[in-house]
Amino acid sequence: DAVVSETAAIINADSPMSRTGLYNLDKDRKGFGYGVNGAMTQFVKVPSRCLHRIPEGVSIEKAALTEPCCVAYNAVINNASIKPGDRVLVLGPGPIGILCGFFSKFSGAETAIVGLESDSSRLEVARQGYELKTLTEGVNEWAYEIDGLGVDVVVDAAGVSESLKLAIELVRPNGTIV
């Protein structure tokens, strides 16, 4: 059978986070390519709990988006509680960032995704493929243009210290950073 895999190769099933179903936050978690040998090989040994059958009729290319879609969905839908009319800024136009932008827009939020000039091809995917507003400059202006307080939600999909600093600067009081 064709399958897709989760990335949590090793978890502590008895940890408090794993027991509540949040094994992705287990402090002892090791992922493929990070703590455990990666999967860029012909064969890889994967725990059965990580595997999910690809339904008939779903292409491998589409199925390959399962894990990043789940990460983005969890961040935006489960954790950010985005509502229609919110203003959301996504930092980082990689696959997960673009998918976060999609789920944010799908939730009814006015959404912009931020990248560097060197991210032009990724920003083009966000703009053309997902109809997201893209920014390489004017980020502060966009964040503060409505009422001067900042955006409701910042999704940090870049994961570097500079993006966290920017998120803190741009989120409104009582806003959310994920």
Say what each PLM segment does:
Residues 80-82, 128-178:
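Glycine-rich cofactor phosphate-binding loops and adjacent beta1-alpha1 units
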Residues 58-139:
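Mid-domain Rossmann-like dinucleotide-binding core that forms the NAD(H)/NADP(H) cofactor-binding site
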Residues 1-51:
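Glycine-rich phosphate/adenylate-binding loop and adjacent beta-alpha elements
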Residues 13, 98, 164-165:
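Glycine/Thr-rich phosphate-binding loops of Rossmann-like dinucleotide-binding domains
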Residues 2, 87, 175-176:
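Short glycine-centered segments of the SAM/dcSAM-binding site in methyltransferase folds
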Residues 50-61, 149:
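Glycine/charged-rich beta-loop-alpha catalytic/anionic-binding loops adjacent to active sites
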Residues 5, 90, 156:
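Redox-cofactor binding/interface segments in oxidoreductases and associated redox assembly factors
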